[in-house]
Amino acid sequence: MRVRFAPSPTGHLHVGGARTAIFNWLFARHHKGTFIVRVEDTDQARSTRQSEDMVLDDLRWLRTLWDEGPDIGGPHAPYRQSERTEIYHRFAAELMKRDVVYRCYCTEEELEQKRKAAEAAGRPPHYDLKCWYNRRNDGAPHAVRFHVPGDGDVTINDLIRGQVTWKKESLGDFIVVRSDGLPTYNFSVVIDDHEMEISHVIRAEEHLTNTHRQVLIYRAMGWQVPEFAHVSLILGPDRSKLSKRHGATSVSQYAEEGFLPEAMFNYLTLLGWSSPDGKELFTREDAVGKFALERVNAAPAVFDHQKLAWLNGQYIHAMSAAELRPLVARFFDAPWIEEGIDVVKTSVHRLTQFADALRFVREFTCAEVDRDFREKLRDELRTGGIPTDEASYKAMVERLKTATGLKGKALFMPLRLAITGSDHGPELVRVIPLLKRASEIDPAVLSPLQRVEQCIR
């Protein structure tokens, strides 16, 4: 089994492209096959080597590493379409010998007039075959057109959508090499997939409308047609095509917003595919073992940012503070960060949220608390000491109950306000020891006692 992911490098990797790459990667790994990255960079105005690097970096971040590609080479190099022009010309010449393509000398102005005339007459805007019937080879600038033979149907058995059929009469002769010498997408993709021995073409639904033309080229060359699987669109919450107005759409944006690659991989795998055991949280190895195109849904998938955030939180909560520290340090760091992570991680769903969740450690503002309560708390912390664990915390609480005559919320709310300056946050049994230890190694942190004393003055 040989599959490929063929991005056009015009910017960072879109989540739709990322999902297609993941499905190809999973299919290859499940079948112990080969996953290839091929760069379709023939759009000279938009494709850049910098954009290619961005796409490859995004794939590396997702850890969907490839076996052959533009950076590592392989037996079917080169893996950039811009470096394969001679190959395309060779096969165009072969098709010319077989009399299935022909030179088209019509200018853009002529073609536009033909289109308008066809539309005015209520006919499909197909090419009128002028250059098919009037062959010449005088060296003038020309495109190369594929001649669609006769009537009949073109049918494929799509592995996701089932049988799909097109009428040949709906096609019209189409260009395979432009007048500037560059191949069209439909021509180059067939040549590349054949030359690279691609067995399964797993790609976005938007390419389905190109498939009948590609099948005709395969047949004209006498080549075996690969299996096709067209993956559905990804929609926004309003069920329109996912776009920037719905929020982040590129993999790199989610990385910058504090999402983990494993969570992103897990979530994108679920967009259109379901595990046979119904699980939504799984390892990469689990997904490889269970992945099958038969379980990919043909219906569009809706991108749910809240579900992605929940899933990301599950991965964060399962990690140790030591594992999270280097990841969190990209966004926020402190000498006490590891202990801080442990205190707040169950309330966090993105790495970027740790900074806000731990802001109370370095930032403190006196909240409105009864002076008598604050003085009793100060005395308790001076004489009983600042709690360092659950046992000493519980002992402090019991003594405060006796000293103040308060219990329940009437005790814990002013205690929280006096220590943190906020009416919500992590459990005090963990916050107070954290503040004590952080104040001993970070001059920007006030200890619990210093906070209470500061607000009595």
Task: Outline where the language-model segments fall.
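Secondary-structure capping and boundary motifs in well-ordered enzyme cores
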Residues: S47, R84-I87, E256, P300, ...
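N-terminal Rossmann-like or analogous alpha/beta NTP/dinucleotide-binding catalytic cores
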Residues: M1-E119, T209-W223, A263
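Active-site cores that bind ATP or allylic diphosphates and position pyrophosphate for catalysis
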Residues: E94, Y102-H230, L235-L242, S250, ...
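C-terminal accessory/binding modules appended to enzymatic or scaffolding proteins
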Residues: E368-G425
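Acidic, glycine-rich active-site loops and adjacent beta-strand->loop/helix elements
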Residues: V39-D43, E205-E206, L235, L308
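Glycine- and acidic
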Residues: R4-P9, V37-D41, M196-V201, T249, ...
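Catalytic adenosine-cofactor/nucleotide-binding cores of aminoacyl-tRNA synthetases and other
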Residues: M221-E227, V231-C366, T420-R457
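Short amphipathic alpha-helical segments and their helix-coil junctions
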Residues: M1-F5, V251, E285-L293, P326-R330, ...
